[in-house]
């Protein structure tokens, strides 16, 4: 066993050869490197598979032996300061390595097809390899210095991947926004690390926990200062895990390729903040005020993320706000001290959300044949609908992922979310009410996404999205704000469906399209005859097998991964508790695992009822519009049974505007911070150029003119120079005499 652990240091470096070789190859042998492009994807998958197998073996050993292994080497040694580096293998590290590698492998397989058209294919795999190395290094680090080093590398990789299509201004702005927002959190993290070192004198986790607990128990340190250091440290996870108020970067990060959203913004990078809080939880747990702040940030993020997801039209942004809300559940669990529940939900959510993001990528891939390659169109749920018969495999996978996130048994997220809801009932009634209500909102907005995408009829060909103009009720579209200027009202589906096309349709026409310097060979189905005398890209199609295979495997994880947390006997034994035994004993040394099955079924029935209520509301509000093809609006539906429609108008309009405008938080930051900083920068620039540079240039110009004037007076005669010199010296001495 010891012989196996001594090779754990190599885990972060196994995926590293791919980005290094790609960089060297593109620099020295660009043609040969590009010709072997598929080889690089295979090599990336192979190397990450090695890490996955190794991590699975370590996890099995953890379950059997239940131990923590650490090995460090000294970097610098002196009397005052000592830096060490090494690796730290415990259940948390094993779980995170398995998550990173399993999701990473399937995302790489998916990306091989999804990114095949892109000229940045090799650059994409180089970034992905470097990102995997950074994440693996982060979760196996043995001290805070290593964690901060890999933490920054993860941030850099996310910046590169979010701005992968940097020629698009929106993507460039999104990666800058993510970078700047995370800088705020990372600055707090650095200050927190330095503060903890100043108090304890150590960066190593084991020493840090022991010294910190002794200082608290013996009352030998200022508790207020410790609380400040812990809060500054917590700012890093707030930004990285998109918690309020540093969550604003996550929806804009969807401008990157969809595989990036599945890997970084579902399973790995945003989970890094949860991982860091879980790693330092023995430190936080002795400061009650910090635990309350963590839980408060979590509950605010839960509610905020759910409400902001209600009116999103972009399918990926809707899933992004869902991710934000679910990360809030994990943070709430950590703030309540529910270590096991938080990590259990981290596992189940990672696989379910990765499945949903890959499913959204398959949907976008199929919609591009109809609406083009603009994200504003291919990701817009306004233009979707009726995709069930066109992409049945994607639909099934997406539906099961949606049901899992809603908390429907026996899917994965049901087991973990139910634990968090039960723990919240014991922690705070107010928090429990908010958490349970948000569970219903989660079911509502997730089924809203599903119904808008797959049910009804293909909305691309609809003439009117917003309802009847003559309606007496204030009209709010189910799909979002009315924007008549962008709707092509000359495009009609009726001639296409009723025409007698004797020539027939031409299938599988090979055409090449140029998108932002990226060439894609796409098979389209075109119609040769139409009343509009234009070619119409007909219906979506199912994705290729290399896109569907990762989704189906993640679907299996979504179905069965929850079993690791299901009690197997009356004593509550399960695989997850056995794996987390060392960490659980550290937090709750006298805890018991007895299971009350009656209480479990009662609480489960309550949480499932809330989820089904949210699903029913979503189905009731959205499904009839597709089944009957009636051109109604949301408020018109309320008018059928509401005796006072004006109240509903104001309420729904208020909720819609709040959600559509992102809670006005982005606007607040723009007005109060961005514009203020820009005005300050302009004033500083003016002061620098006009005042600072003006003084410097003025001295030079003055010296020049004084010299010219002196030369003119002297007339190039030595006697004149001597006379002026003596005159100045005499005046100087006279001035000194007057002063004395």
Swiss-Prot record:
* Membrane-spanning intervals of the chain: 9-29, 40-60, 89-109, 125-145, 147-167, 185-205, 221-241, 258-278, 283-303, 327-347, 354-374, 396-416, 425-445, 547-567, 606-626, 718-738
Per the annotation, which location comes first and is thus the protein's main one?
plastid
The reaction(s) this protein catalyses: a plastoquinone + NADH + (n+1) H(+)(in) = a plastoquinol + NAD(+) + n H(+)(out); a plastoquinone + NADPH + (n+1) H(+)(in) = a plastoquinol + NADP(+) + n H(+)(out)
Keywords, ordered alphabetically: Chloroplast, Membrane, NAD, NADP, Plastid, Plastoquinone, Quinone, Thylakoid, Translocase, Transmembrane, Transmembrane helix, Transport
Q: Does the keyword NADP apply?
A: yes
Q: Where in the cell is it found?
A: Plastid, Chloroplast thylakoid membrane
Q: Which GO terms describe its cellular component?
A: chloroplast thylakoid membrane
**What is the name listed in the Swiss-Prot or TrEMBL entry for this protein?**
NAD(P)H-quinone oxidoreductase subunit 5, chloroplastic
Origin organism is Aethionema grandiflorum (Persian stone-cress)
């Amino acid at each position: 066993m010891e012989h196996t652990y001594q090779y754990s240091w190599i885990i972060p470096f196994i995926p590293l050869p791919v980005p290094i070789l790609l960089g060297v190859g593109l620099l020295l042998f660009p043609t040969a490197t590009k010709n072997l492009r598929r080889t690089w994807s295979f090599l990336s998958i192979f190397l990450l598979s090695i890490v996955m197998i190794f991590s699975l073996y370590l996890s099995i050993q953890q379950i059997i032996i239940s131990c923590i292994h650490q090995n460090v080497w000294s970097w610098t040694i002196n009397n005052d300061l000592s830096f060490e580096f090494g690796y730290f293998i415990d259940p948390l590290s094993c779980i995170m390595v398995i998550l990173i590698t399993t999701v990473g492998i399937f995302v790489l397989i998916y990306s091989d097809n999804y990114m095949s058209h892109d000229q940045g294919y090799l650059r994409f795999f180089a970034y992905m390899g470097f990102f995997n190395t950074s994440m693996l290094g982060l979760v196996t680090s043995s001290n805070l210095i290593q964690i901060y080093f890999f933490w920054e590398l993860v941030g850099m990789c996310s910046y590169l991947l979010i701005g992968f299509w940097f020629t698009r201004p929106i993507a460039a702005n999104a990666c800058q926004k993510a970078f700047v927002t995370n800088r705020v959190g990372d600055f707090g993290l650095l200050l927190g690390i330095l503060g903890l070192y100043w108090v304890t004198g150590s960066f190593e986790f084991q020493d840090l926990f022991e010294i910190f607990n002794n200082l608290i128990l013996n009352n030998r340190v200022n508790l207020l200062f410790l609380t400040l250091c812990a809060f500054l440290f917590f700012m890093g996870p707030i930004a990285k895990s998109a918690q309020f108020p540093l969550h604003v970067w996550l929806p804009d990060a969807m401008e990157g390729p969809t595989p990036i959203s599945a890997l970084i913004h579902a399973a790995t990078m945003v989970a890094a903040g949860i991982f860091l809080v879980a790693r330092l939880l023995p430190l936080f747990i002795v400061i009650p005020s910090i635990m309350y702040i963590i839980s408060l940030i979590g509950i605010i993020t839960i509610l905020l993320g759910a409400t902001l997801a209600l009116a999103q039209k972009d399918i990926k942004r809707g899933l992004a706000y869902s991710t934000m809300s679910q990360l809030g559940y994990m943070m709430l669990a950590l703030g309540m001290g529910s270590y096991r529940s938080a990590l259990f939900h981290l596992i189940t959510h990672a696989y379910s959300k990765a499945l949903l993001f890959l499913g959204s990528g398959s949907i976008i891939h199929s919609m591009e044949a109809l609406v083009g390659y603009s994200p504003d169109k291919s990701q817009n749920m306004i233009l979707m609908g009726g995709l069930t018969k066109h992409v049945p495999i994607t639909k099934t996978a997406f539906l099961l992922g949606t049901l899992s996130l809603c908390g429907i048994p026996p899917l994965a997220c049901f087991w973990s979310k139910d634990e968090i809801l039960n723990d919240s009932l014991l922690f705070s009634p107010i928090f429990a009410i908010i958490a349970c209500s948000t569970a219903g909102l989660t079911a509502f907005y997730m089924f809203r996404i599903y119904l808008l995408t797959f049910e009804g009829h293909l909305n691309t060909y609809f003439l009117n999205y917003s309802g009847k103009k003559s309606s007496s009720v204030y009209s709010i579209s189910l799909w979002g704000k009315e924007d008549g200027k962008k709707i092509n009202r000359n495009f009609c589906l009726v001639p296409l469906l009723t025409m007698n096309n004797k020539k027939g349709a031409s299938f599988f026409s090979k055409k090449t399209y140029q998108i932002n310097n990226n060439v894609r060979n796409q098979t389209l189905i075109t119609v040769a005859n139409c009343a509009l005398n234009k070619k119409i890209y007909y219906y979506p199609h199912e994705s290729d097998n290399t896109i569907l295979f990762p989704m189906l495997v993640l679907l299996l994880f979504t179905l069965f991964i929850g079993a690791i947390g299901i009690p197997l006997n009356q004593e509550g034994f399960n695989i997850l508790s056995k794996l987390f035994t060392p960490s659980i004993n550290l937090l709750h040394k006298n805890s018991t695992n007895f299971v009350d099955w009656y209480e479990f079924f009662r609480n489960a029935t309550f949480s499932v009822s809330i989820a089904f209520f949210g699903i029913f509301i979503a189905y009731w509000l959205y499904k009839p519009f597709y089944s009957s093809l009636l051109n109604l609006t949301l408020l018109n539906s309320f008018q059928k049974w509401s005796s006072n429609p004006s109240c509903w108008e104001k309420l729904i309009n208020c909720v819609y505007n709040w959600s559509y405008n992102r809670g006005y938080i982005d606007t607040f930051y723009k007005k109060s911070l961005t514009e203020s900083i820009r005005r300050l920068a302009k004033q500083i620039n003016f002061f620098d150029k006009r005042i600072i540079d003006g003084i410097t240039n003025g001295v030079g110009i003055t010296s020049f003119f004084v010299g010219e004037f002196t030369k003119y007076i002297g007339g190039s005669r030595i006697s004149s120079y001597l006379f002026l010199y003596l005159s100045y010296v005499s005046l100087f001495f006279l001035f000194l005499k007057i002063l004395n």
